[in-house]
Amino acid sequence: MFRKIALVLASVLLISGCTSVEPKPWSAGSGPIKIVASTDVWGSVANLVAGDRASVTALIYNSSQDPHSFEPSVRDQLAVNNADVVIMNGGGYDDFMTKLVAADPTPAIVVNAFAVSGADKSRNEHIWYDVDQVGAVAEAIAAAVKNTDSSLASFKSSLAKLKEKLNTLKVANTCGRVFATEPVIDYLLDDAGCVNVTPLAFSKAIEEERDVSPAVMEQAKNALAVPGTVLASNISVTSSQISQLESGHVGEFGFGELLPQDPDTGAYGGNYLDMIDGSITMLGWKK
């Protein structure tokens, strides 16, 4: 029952790696301040914070686009050249943005989320799954667009509610054992009090697109064999070794690096807050 409901909910909340239509470019707002974000996740955060003051576009909105190896187009460079504010994840996640900004003859205000958050360079760069760090980034975005209305306060209030939901899971020890195929959601797992049973060598190999060794694969299978262990996999990544783990496993859900889209229409089904809330809901599902 868990698997069935989890997969249905994941298909609504998260991007499918096998969308049947071409994903639609992401943009929001119509204000005079032009914001360009590296991904639609950060674009959504910017839109929620800037409100009516800005128009926001994202360069990456398709699960087939890998931020680590993304090759920007001339159109992408023009978008950055015309931007008033540029938002990037940083931490080695979207280095293509550094090159685009460097080539801009009239540099925009740059918000580097990883740098703003103060995260150690050796830490996980997927900081949009850490609601505390996103709050700090939101303040930097608000300062960049000189936003003094209620948008920032409303966004931070929503983040506080998500944090409260995570704390509830942690105190109640609800989450339990989770095997995450990649470290993308590690911040969320920590905040929810989950027991991350993923062998480090496994997640590192998958993230670096290398084959997992037979010995590590055996460790992974043993970890998943423990009753109550949930398999969390990145739905934009395909791997025969991940498929082996998924085969026949009961507790399973997907997580993404981009905003949710309808697999049939390509339409967006939610914003950043919806995405994180959906992931938290899955972590707290009774198994």
Label the predicted regions.
Residues 1-22:
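Secretory targeting and sorting signals
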Residues 18-287:
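Extracytoplasmic metal-acquisition and chelation regions
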